Design a protein with these regions (language model features):
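Conserved phosphate- and dinucleotide-binding cores of soluble alpha/beta proteins
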Residues: 4-95
Length: 95
């Protein structure tokens, strides 16, 4: 059973983890699928602490549908970050 937007309506989360296709400091987190973006957006709005799991190749990329602002989540990432990204407190490099 796949979680739909309707299924997600009454659910509240203490912590949540999401993937993303694109991360932009100015434009936020994005994905190419409208339904996926709607579920992610709604579930993030109902979550106390949001985490985005993404490798470093997702930074400075933008897919067609935005689901959250950059400051709405802590990004957990692997790989080397560009020096300009190291100043953001919501980006954590996992080794």
């Amino acid at each position: 059973h796949t979680l739909s937007l309707h299924d997600a309506l009454p659910i509240y989360f203490t912590k949540g983890f999401w993937g993303t296709n694109g991360i932009s400091v100015t434009k936020g987190f994005s994905t190419p699928e409208v339904k996926e973006a709607m579920v992610k957006k709604h579930s993030m709005e109902n979550c106390k602490k949001c985490y985005i799991l993404a490798d470093s190749s997702k930074f400075d990329q933008m897919s067609s549908v935005k689901f959250a602002d950059f400051d709405q989540a802590t990004v957990l990432t692997t790989g080397l970050l560009k020096p300009a990204l190291k100043k953001y407190k919501n980006i954590v490099e996992v080794k």
